């Protein structure tokens, strides 16, 4: 009976709850009562021993008396596994924290391999590894080393031309009509470019022109190129041919592309080669003589453009006089 009580638990078992403890019926009442009393005394003694043993082995101070805490081996294993898992997570977190600076350094090293192309005028600061001094270099020097003879040269600002008109159109055309190479016909859809190199003895270029009956487009540009001859030449081209020629010049300059920058070079270099003195506009050259002058900005070739590309029906007779002064 003591084994059964221990299995059921000493705290939940009560002798008054068992059947037959209150006495029987008939002749068996006395015998059953004495047996019940003996059983009750024995159970009380067993309960006292079990309570003393439970109080000695129970580590929890707040557990109620006579109710020992039963801990299964499975719960102990689960607690131990939880502690191990927590320790492993903490170790992984520490490892990640240790590796984070190294990863960041590796990313920065990879980013440093890709250098951003410097534009003209940017400043490059170089830290010396030996003395700690800071050297300031212009990016133009690096561009010059990379481009060589094809480096981009920013042209100086063009001074505005001096222009005027006068009304003696008939006298002007009559005089130039008798001179050689002072009269030409600009056909419909054509553009005539008169190339005038700078002269070693001159300081400015001057021009005068007039037309018969109709106006014409006129503009002046400057080509920053070395002068090999002082001869004035006339170039006649169709409007489409003129555009194709400009594209060919762009392609020729596109060949020496700066290393590391595929978007720089040709077109910007072409713009840097030609300076605009005055844009092409339609001039009333059939009413007044159009005249002007421009001081030499340096060595190069003036491009005087007479544009009749907008006219699809009429040719224009042009009278012109171009010279230099000191």
Swiss-Prot record:
Keyword Acetylation annotated: yes
Region described as Disordered: spans on this chain: 1-80, 238-268
Biased composition (Acidic residues): 239-255
Superkingdom of source: Eukaryota
Segments forming domain GOLD: 160-324
Residues recorded with modification N6-acetyllysine: 170
Keywords tagged on the record: Acetylation
Matches recorded under Pfam families: GOLD_2
PROSITE patterns from the UniProt entry: GOLD (PS50866)
Protein known as: Protein TMED8
Species whose genome carries this gene: Pongo abelii
Lineage, highest ranks first: Eukaryota, Metazoa, Chordata, Craniata, Vertebrata
């Amino acid at each position: 009976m003591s084994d059964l009580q221990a299995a059921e638990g000493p705290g939940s078992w009560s002798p008054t709850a068992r059947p037959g403890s209150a006495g029987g019926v008939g002749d068996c009442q006395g015998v059953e009562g004495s047996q019940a009393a003996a059983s009750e005394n024995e159970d009380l003694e067993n309960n006292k021993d079990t309570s003393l043993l439970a109080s000695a082995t129970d580590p929890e101070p707040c557990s109620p008396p006579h109710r020992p805490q039963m801990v299964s081996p499975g719960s102990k294993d689960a607690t131990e596994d939880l502690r191990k898992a927590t320790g492993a997570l903490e170790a992984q977190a520490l490892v990640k924290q240790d590796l984070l600076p190294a990863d960041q350094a590796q990313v920065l090293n990879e980013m440093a391999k890709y250098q951003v192309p410097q534009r003209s005028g940017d400043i490059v600061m170089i830290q010396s590894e030996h003395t700690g001094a800071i050297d300031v270099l212009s990016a133009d020097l690096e561009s010059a080393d990379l481009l060589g003879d094809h480096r981009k040269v920013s042209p100086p600002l063009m001074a505005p031309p001096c222009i005027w008109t006068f009304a003696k159109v008939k006298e002007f055309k009559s005089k130039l009509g008798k001179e050689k190479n002072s009269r030409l016909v600009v056909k419909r859809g054509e553009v005539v470019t008169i190339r005038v190199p700078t002269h070693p003895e001159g300081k400015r270029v001057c021009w005068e022109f007039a037309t018969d009956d109709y106006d014409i487009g006129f503009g002046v540009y400057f080509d920053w190129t070395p002068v090999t001859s002082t001869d004035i030449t006339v170039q006649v081209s169709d409007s489409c041919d003129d555009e194709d020629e400009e594209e060919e010049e762009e392609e020729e300059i596109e060949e020496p592309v700066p290393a590391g920058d595929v978007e720089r070079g040709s077109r910007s270099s072409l713009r840097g080669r030609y300076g605009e003195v005055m844009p092409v506009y339609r001039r009333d050259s059939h009413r007044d003589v159009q005249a002007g002058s421009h001081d030499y900005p340096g060595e190069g070739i003036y491009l005087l453009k007479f544009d009749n590309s907008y006219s699809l029906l009429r040719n224009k007779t042009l009278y012109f006089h171009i010279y230099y002064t000191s």
